[in-house]
């Protein structure tokens, strides 16, 4: 197959503002057909740092146009990559002359999804694929394949798997689950498009985020798979349910900026304005997922009504992960359990259970073994503290749990388990009283006890240091000098 690497010069088929034209890596407006499916391979064009939509897709075009809102108000600021890295117009707080714009010493250049796919995919090298699993052969070794045989094990080590796959855990694991659940055959999916879709998802996670990155997405997807295997769900879910659940799990934190919703609101971030300060991040994750679904053309062979239904239901799943709405979903779930009227043959009830399953998967870190849970705790705390450092630097007021000088990992985790994790997983165990549910609750108890032990040690150490300092101050000057 011959590929033209030169960008075609096409006339603009709509008025485009000058600030968009001047933006490097902005939207590619094209009159040609979709990227895949062009009758002439020379019509393929490289993505220029953003999503390239067909000119007729007004909704998708609008979604990506939103990314240019920042350009109008931040002249002179150079973005490191596209996406939702939070931008604050600090001229509100300081004059332009007082701002010091620091440039990262590490120049991170995002390899565009099609570009990376073009270089690495076996399909573009003309290699025939006779089995759906053969697509995995070039990407990870026998150890990773061996791990995938135990992908339904709750002790699955996603950190080890990510190392074995050279940082491609989300692509490798999700593709395997699509094959394992028979989704490729059932929905007649083009493996090339599926592969490209998963690569784009993985790339749109920010690897520099300590916690909200592609590894977290892979971990949540693996947990979701475990829940789908539970008897009550396994006997009732349809292939459609499984498809939506896996896509929602893989994309539930897509393009996460590494800061929380209150940060975006108090800095007047354009996403907060767009979504009216309501489930800001979750709405953005959902809309980003919709953009990639449309760009990849993975389900272009399905009827329009089915595609629209898919987008809506994926949105409902992702929006359920908004931690600020935990009590709302938990109360509804608990009331159904109290009445005993959950009927999994009812699509609405089944969808509620899938929402609760994704919520559990999203915050299941304390339910893992101590070795895994501790790593996740350290990573999420690092991300919290990084946000707190930014807030201190620009005098924004440090958000709760984000001050590294007053908070500790132990305190944060104990509170998280007590007020969020235990109530959620207790109700999940009422719904699905299985060995896995009891194992998860058991891990929560053990991990909480471990953090309390570390908390006591830290408190004892601080008391000892304080006493030593006090004694040193009380000693006569000559004794201290001697």
From Swiss-Prot:
Cofactor binding, note field: Binds 2 divalent metal cations per subunit. Site 1 may preferentially bind zinc ions, while site 2 has a preference for magnesium and/or manganese ions.
- UniProt note on regulation of activity: Insensitive to all selective PDE inhibitors.
SMART domains associated with the record: HDc
What this protein is called in its record is High affinity 3',5'-cyclic-AMP phosphodiesterase 7A
Annotated a divalent metal cation 2 binding sites: 253
Q: Name one GO biological process term.
A: cAMP-mediated signaling
Q: Has keyword Nucleotide-binding?
A: no
Single GO MF descriptor: metal ion binding
